[in-house]
């Protein structure tokens, strides 16, 4: 599986998921009046205030 791994500050790239990972995630939150979006392989639990979307494809 290949997921985008945009971390907001380095631009959009992609990565091949390791260890048989079958999901990608996108999480977003607001920090110091700026919206932060992070994408990568996996789908984990997040803390309150963070929006998480998980998918099988990009």
Swiss-Prot record:
It comes from the Eukaryota. It holds the Pfam family Toxin_cobra-type. Expressed by the venom gland. GO terms for cellular component: extracellular region. Gene3D superfamilies: CD59 (2.10.60.10). Its main location: secreted. It is found in: Secreted. The keyword Disulfide bond applies. Keywords: Acetylcholine receptor inhibiting toxin, Disulfide bond, Ion channel impairing toxin, Neurotoxin, Postsynaptic neurotoxin, Secreted, Toxin. GO terms for molecular function: acetylcholine receptor inhibitor activity; ion channel regulator activity; toxin activity. Belongs to the three-finger toxin family. Short-chain subfamily. Type I alpha-neurotoxin sub-subfamily. Binds to muscle nicotinic acetylcholine receptor (nAChR) and inhibit acetylcholine from binding to the receptor, thereby impairing neuromuscular transmission. This is Weak neurotoxin D2B. The lineage of its organism: Eukaryota, Metazoa, Chordata, Craniata, Vertebrata.
């Amino acid at each position: 599986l290949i997921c985008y791994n945009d971390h907001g500050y380095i631009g959009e790239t992609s990565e091949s998921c390791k260890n048989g990972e079958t999901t990608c995630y996108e999480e977003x939150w607001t920090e110091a009046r700026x919206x932060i979006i992070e994408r990568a392989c996996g789908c984990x639990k997040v803390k309150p205030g963070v929006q998480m979307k998980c998918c099988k494809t990009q």
